[in-house]
Curated annotation (Swiss-Prot):
CC terms in the record's Gene Ontology section: cytosol
Domain of life: Bacteria
Annotated keywords: Protein biosynthesis, Transferase
UniProt: (6S)-5,6,7,8-tetrahydrofolate binding residues: 110-113
Catalytic activity: L-methionyl-tRNA(fMet) + (6R)-10-formyltetrahydrofolate = N-formyl-L-methionyl-tRNA(fMet) + (6S)-5,6,7,8-tetrahydrofolate + H(+)
Catalytic activity, EC: 2.1.2.9
Family recorded in the similarity comment: Belongs to the Fmt family.
Gene: fmt
Enzyme class: transferase
Protein's UniProt name: Methionyl-tRNA formyltransferase
Recorded GO MF terms: methionyl-tRNA formyltransferase activity
SUPFAM superfamilies per the UniProt record, alphabetical: FMT C-terminal domain-like, Formyltransferase
Length: 328
């Protein structure tokens, strides 16, 4: 039985933790995660999903900073043979990597070397990739550049959000992850160097990145919305009274409008506007459309500043928008 230490923090790491804990080939001797963080309106300290799961499973938890002497002492006391790390949220220094004899192995949500970095699933959706996947690779000091031990590939539907894609990859990747590390322990694993071609970086998506430019084409905005859902959330500024006609300046202070779901407008629907200017709003009885750099985009779910998430048509009726209302 391999003694395994597991490092992870968010929900996407939980299926893998549960899979290792349930597999008789492994003894999960410890779980490393980030410290409790303030959440919600009350800013109450809350354990990470991985810590909460570890405590439910009766597993010892280390939630110290990885560069502290106390962390190294706690890690060494586990006497782990092998380590799994998935979405931990901290860079592991060399002394930590060297402390586990068989090494550290990461489950990464792309087919490497494409989309190395922090947001692989999000970037795959935003780019309109037809496929993506998950790889298990040995962690080194470089960024996601270690040899691959196992890999799976899936087709994208073209309608999933990044949250849905991550959930799917987390579930489908977990059994592969467990089998890959078992093979490493048994000495039967194959280590394949990453190809030299096809390298792209999946930089973290910032709040400013998530702001919609309505001069982009409808299909591109649709991908942006899905890539940014649920985090950080695609958004725009709503000018409910519209611009002033003589100088095109907004008539009132704008409000933030989060776009939770949208899709390129159905051009076969007779109610769909034939043409709208970028950012121009058109409200129908059951639909809300926005002009883009190509065809209109239909908004299906939104969250206005200070309001709850709701169907776009319901929001528009309650907002009592001026006919000149626009988004920018």
């Amino acid at each position: 039985m391999l003694k395994l230490v597991f490092a992870g923090t968010p929900d996407v790491a939980v299926p893998s933790l549960k899979a290792f804990a349930a597999d008789p080939r492994f003894d999960v001797v410890g779980v490393i995660t980030r410290p409790d963080a303030p959440t919600g309106r009350g800013r109450k300290l809350t354990p990470s999903p991985v810590k909460a799961t570890a405590l439910e499973l009766g597993l010892p938890v280390i939630d110290l900073k990885p560069r502290s002497p106390e962390f190294m002492e706690a890690l060494n006391n586990l006497h782990a043979d092998i380590a799994a790390v998935i979405a931990y949220g901290n860079i592991l220094p060399k002394n930590v990597l060297d402390a586990v004899p068989m090494g550290w192995y990461n489950l990464h949500f792309s087919n490497l070397p494409k989309w190395r970095g922090a947001a692989p699933a999000q970037r795959a959706i935003w780019a309109g990739d037809p496929t993506t996947g998950a790889d298990v690779f040995k962690v080194g000091e470089g960024l996601d550049d270690g040899p691959i031990v196992a890999s799976l590939t899936i087709e994208l539907t073209g309608r999933e959000t990044s949250g849905e894609l991550l959930d799917r990859l987390a579930e489908e990747g977990a059994p592969m992850y467990v089998d890959a590390l078992a093979a490493v322990g048994e000495g039967t694993a194959t280590f394949t160097a990453q190809p030299a071609e096809g390298l792209e970086y999946a930089h973290k998506i910032t709040v400013e990145d998530a702001r919609i430019s309505w001069t982009d084409e409808a299909e591109a905005i649709d991908r942006q919305v899905r890539a940014c859902t649920p985090h950080p959330g695609a958004w725009t500024e709503l000018f409910a009274e519209g611009p002033i006609a003589d100088n095109d300046e907004p008539a009132a202070k704008p409000l933030t409008l989060h776009i939770l779901a949208a899709q390129p407008a159905d051009q076969s629907n007779p109610n769909t506007p034939a043409e709208l200017q970028p950012g121009e709003l058109k409200v129908g009885k059951k639909n809300v459309w926005v002009g883009t750099g190509s065809t209109p985009l239909e908004l299906t779910q939104v969250k206005a500043q200070g309001k709850k998430a709701m169907r776009a048509a319901d929001w528009a009726r309650g907002a009592r928008l001026s006919p000149a209302a626009c988004v920018r």
